[in-house]
């Protein structure tokens, strides 16, 4: 698929994500609870729960916390109810941003997201204002050393998809949303737990960020959005240039 953000963006984000592990776990649990309430506790007949569990395992959410979340959601006394919302807008430089949220207070979440965009010079638009610049699909990633690109492609084809990109550190497999769980299960049996596995928005084309100030501003916006407990994931159609990536990596050390 054209335009997927390359490994350097993923690697630069990973350090920040590791520091937010507790918050990431909280968001994964919220998705599991929502999936159970929307369907059942059986992932075999609840595709959303099956996807939520796959994502949680790829992020190393402990099994006891997964089980606790499922049991809690199935408890009639549990009054947690979250609504799915998607926000779309532009960061400075015409970078398209999609924000997926699960919230129990739409007004609060909308205010937080709008404030984040405004603080860093972006503009929150209407739903549908940028999603045409992305493909909504499943994303599964394995480290490069897990196998050769040829073997990964062969396995992916067996699993039901031939959309794979291998770069300097990652194999990325893309799937239709309907086949995501099946493909992930097949790959997991062959290669073990994926480094990343989720349904998200992959840019059809990317804008190269080759200015340090613009890159820092953009990443601060993404970080601020991700700090919200209600925000599940943030997607953008940008890619850091090699030079800017190296500069930012150096400033993080």
Curated annotation (Swiss-Prot):
Main location: cytoplasm
InterPro entries per record: Integrase-like_N, TACO1_YebC-like_2nd/3rd_dom, TACO1_YebC_N, Transcrip_reg_TACO1-like, Transcrip_reg_TACO1-like_dom3, YebC-like
GO BP: any one term: regulation of DNA-templated transcription
One Pfam family, short name: TACO1_YebC_N
GO MF term list: DNA binding
Compartment(s) of residence: Cytoplasm
Keyword line: Cytoplasm, DNA-binding, Transcription, Transcription regulation
A GO cellular component entry from the record: cytoplasm
SUPFAM superfamilies: YebC-like
Residues covered by region (Disordered): 1-21
Protein family per UniProt: Belongs to the TACO1 family.
The protein, known as: Probable transcriptional regulatory protein RBE_0568
